[in-house]
C-alpha cells in the first residue's frame, strides 16, 4: 500500500485553535485537546457575560442616578424621577442621566426641577 500524504485541513484547524488559545496558560495553550475544550469554555463565558455586562451597567447607572437625586432632595428618589420623566414623555435611557449626574450635577438638578413643575 502506498503512503498517503495528508492534507493541510486538520493542521489549519488546529493552528486556528492554537492562535485563539495562545494567551491561555500552561497546557491550555499547547495541547490540542485541552485547547479545544478551553476555547469552547471561553466562548460560552463570553456569550453569557455579554448579557451580564448589560445588566451590570444598567445597575450601575441606576445607582449613580439615585445617589445624585437623593443628595439633592431627601424626598426625591430615582423611581420618582423616572416616573416623572415618563409622565412628561421624555424618553431618556438610564445611561444619559447617569453621565449627566457624573459630569454636571447641576444640569441634572435643573432637569429634575423642571420635570416636577
From Swiss-Prot:
Gene Ontology biological-process entries: ribosomal large subunit assembly; translation
Keywords, sorted A to Z: Chloroplast, Plastid, Ribonucleoprotein, Ribosomal protein, RNA-binding, rRNA-binding
GO molecular function: rRNA binding; structural constituent of ribosome
Database matches in Pfam families: Ribosomal_L20
Entry superkingdom: Eukaryota
PROSITE patterns reported in the protein's UniProt record: RIBOSOMAL_L20
CC annotations in GO: chloroplast; ribonucleoprotein complex; ribosome
InterPro entries: Ribosomal_bL20, RIBOSOMAL_L20_CS, Ribosomal_protein_bL20_C
Subcellular location: Plastid, Chloroplast
Primary location: plastid
Family classification: Belongs to the bacterial ribosomal protein bL20 family.
HAMAP family from the UniProt entry: Ribosomal_bL20
Purpose of the protein: Binds directly to 23S ribosomal RNA and is necessary for the in vitro assembly process of the 50S ribosomal subunit. It is not involved in the protein synthesizing functions of that subunit.
NCBIfam families, alphabetized: rplT_bact (TIGR01032)
Name by which UniProt lists this protein: Large ribosomal subunit protein bL20c
Organism: Liriodendron tulipifera (Tuliptree)
Lineage: Eukaryota, Viridiplantae, Streptophyta, Embryophyta, Tracheophyta
Name of the gene: rpl20
Amino acid at each position: 500500500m502506498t503512503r498517503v500524504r495528508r492534507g493541510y485541513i486538520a493542521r489549519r484547524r488546529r493552528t486556528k485553535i492554537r492562535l485563539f488559545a495562545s494567551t491561555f496558560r500552561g497546557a491550555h495553550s499547547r495541547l490540542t485537546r485541552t485547547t479545544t475544550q478551553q476555547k469552547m469554555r471561553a466562548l460560552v463565558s463570553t456569550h453569557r457575560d455579554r448579557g451580564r455586562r448589560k445588566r451590570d451597567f444598567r445597575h450601575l447607572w441606576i445607582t449613580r442616578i439615585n445617589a445624585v437625586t437623593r443628595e439633592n432632595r431627601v424626598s426625591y428618589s430615582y423611581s420618582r424621577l423616572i416616573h416623572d420623566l415618563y409622565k412628561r414623555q421624555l424618553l431618556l435611557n438610564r445611561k444619559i442621566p447617569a453621565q449627566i449626574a457624573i459630569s454636571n450635577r447641576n444640569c441634572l438638578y435643573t432637569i429634575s426641577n423642571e420635570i416636577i413643575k
